[in-house]
């Protein structure tokens, strides 16, 4: 019973940290700060976070930043790739582009162009819209 209660507490703490990360994606994160949000020591937090999410903290933060940045590339076309890189806390556009390409296997510029072309095609060919929305 105690183990189940501990697990619930850990889950609540990790969800709290995940919410904190989501709300502060544009700022750099410090392990001690996130551990404090969770209410654990740095070592304990890092271990618990990895065991619950199956990702290291750095992997998780980068994945979330890249997912949000990918959405910005499509829906915030008025922003340059450099603006998006800085907004999500990358030191420069080269680091962002390299990290993005390692994750999506395509550069941010190619990703943006590909998705925009796909959206334009879907608008002119409504039959394909349901297929595109599923992806």
Where are these regions (language model features)?
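…primarily DNA-binding HTH/wHTH and HhH modules…
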Residues: 1-8, 74, 98-135
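Terminal helix-turn-helix DNA-binding modules in bacterial transcription factors
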Residues: 15-32, 52-87, 115-134
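Basic/polar phosphate-binding segments, predominantly the helix-turn-helix DNA-binding elements
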Residues: 1-6, 16, 28-64, 85-107
């Amino acid at each position: 019973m105690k183990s189940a209660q501990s697990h619930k507490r850990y889950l609540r703490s990790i969800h709290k940290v995940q919410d904190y990360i989501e709300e502060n994606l544009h700022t750099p994160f410090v392990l001690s700060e996130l551990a404090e949000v969770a209410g654990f020591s740095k070592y304990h937090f890092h271990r618990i976070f990895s065991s619950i999410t199956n990702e290291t903290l750095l992997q998780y933060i980068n994945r979330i930043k890249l997912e949000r940045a990918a959405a910005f590339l499509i829906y915030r076309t008025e922003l340059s790739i450099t603006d998006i890189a800085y907004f999500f806390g990358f030191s420069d556009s080269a680091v962002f582009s390299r990290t993005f390409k390692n994750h999506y296997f395509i550069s941010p510029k190619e990703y943006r162009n590909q998705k925009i072309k796909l959206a334009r095609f879907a608008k002119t060919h409504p039959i394909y819209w349901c297929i595109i929305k599923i992806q």
